[in-house]
């Protein structure tokens, strides 16, 4: 009886490594890669042979080679976002690296893209249907806090248009508006908060009207 096929890997379960040496395959099933190549491990169900992808090619890699001859990259999406490296970010997403993963600071890749002012990275992350806009890191800051603090009005505008919340406070009880370092960011945030306040008031009035009509 043949064993069932391995379950497809879930986003976020992909392990990512950088090859320290070139690997020469001995069989057609094995994956060739060179020193410095990024390897995405998608199936570790076999203890001896792992399935991996590099430069669009997929094949088998001896697990002991990866363990001994490759450098683990813990948060590749975050690194790509910090550096503004769009091609690497796209490759990570294509290889199902989780878009909402958190680094040691509790930050997402979106946070670092906003912190660095990398609008093209933010645009690419926004193509992911399950992107989390309002994740707060260990300091309580969101991507909107980061963009406002660094003064990137174009990114603040993108986040607000996507539906980022303006009412979240960080550990110092500060809103994104309180963190804004220039007039353009502050103006966008004030306008959005004003719109939200009017909408909330309108909803409350509708609720009271409904109660009165009962």
From Swiss-Prot:
Residue positions where N-acetylserine is found in the record: 2
Protein name listed in UniProt: Osteoclast-stimulating factor 1
CDD domains: SH3_OSTF1
Swiss-Prot/TrEMBL ANK repeat ranges: 72-101, 105-135, 139-168
Residue positions, PTM Phosphoserine: 202, 213
Gene name as annotated: OSTF1
Protein task: Induces bone resorption, acting probably through a signaling cascade which results in the secretion of factor(s) enhancing osteoclast formation and activity.
Domain SH3: 12-71
Repeat among keywords: yes
Species of provenance: Sus scrofa (Pig)
């Amino acid at each position: 009886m043949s064993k069932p096929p391995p379950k497809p890997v879930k986003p976020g379960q992909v392990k990512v490594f950088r090859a320290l040496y070139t690997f020469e395959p001995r069989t057609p099933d094995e994956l060739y890669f060179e020193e410095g190549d990024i390897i995405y491990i998608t199936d570790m169900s076999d203890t001896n042979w792992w399935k991996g992808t590099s430069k669009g090619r997929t094949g088998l890699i001896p697990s002991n080679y990866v363990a001994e001859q490759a450098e683990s990259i813990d948060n590749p999406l975050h690194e790509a976002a910090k550096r503004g490296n769009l091609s690497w970010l796209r490759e990570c997403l294509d290889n199902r690296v989780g878009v909402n993963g958190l680094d040691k600071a509790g930050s997402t890749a979106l946070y670092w893209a906003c912190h660095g002012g990398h609008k093209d990275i933010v645009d690419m992350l926004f193509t992911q249907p399950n992107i989390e806009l309002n994740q707060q890191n260990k300091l309580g800051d969101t991507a909107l806090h980061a963009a406002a603090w660094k003064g990137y009005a174009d990114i603040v505008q993108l986040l607000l248009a996507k539906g980022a919340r303006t009412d979240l406070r960080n550990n110092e009880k500060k809103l994104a508006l309180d963190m804004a370092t220039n007039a353009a960011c502050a103006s966008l945030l004030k306008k959005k908060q004003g719109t939200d306040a009017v909408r909330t008031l309108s909803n409350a009035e509708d609720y009271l009207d409904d109660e009165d009509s009962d």
